[in-house]
């Protein structure tokens, strides 16, 4: 079973413009303790936007 404080938790990425939650991914907490920001394609905005980790 997974530990309560998993080292690679699942995170959701939301578009900063339209706030839709488009992507689910995993991250390593030791390497990236801060919120993750990636530039990815948003199908609702029809262009590449900054997606930020949500809680």
Curated annotation (Swiss-Prot):
The lineage of its organism: Bacteria, Bacillati, Actinomycetota, Actinomycetes, Acidothermales. Keywords: Ribonucleoprotein, Ribosomal protein. Coiled coil: none annotated. This is Large ribosomal subunit protein bL33. The keyword Kinase does not apply. InterPro entries: Ribosomal_bL33 (IPR001705), Ribosomal_bL33_CS (IPR018264), Ribosomal_bL33_sf (IPR038584), Ribosomal_zn-bd (IPR011332). SUPFAM superfamilies: Zn-binding ribosomal proteins. It holds the Pfam family Ribosomal_L33. It comes from Acidothermus cellulolyticus (strain ATCC 43068 / DSM 8971 / 11B). Belongs to the bacterial ribosomal protein bL33 family. GO terms for molecular function: structural constituent of ribosome. HAMAP family: Ribosomal_bL33. One of its GO terms (cellular component) is ribonucleoprotein complex. Disulfide bonds: none annotated. GO terms for biological process: translation.
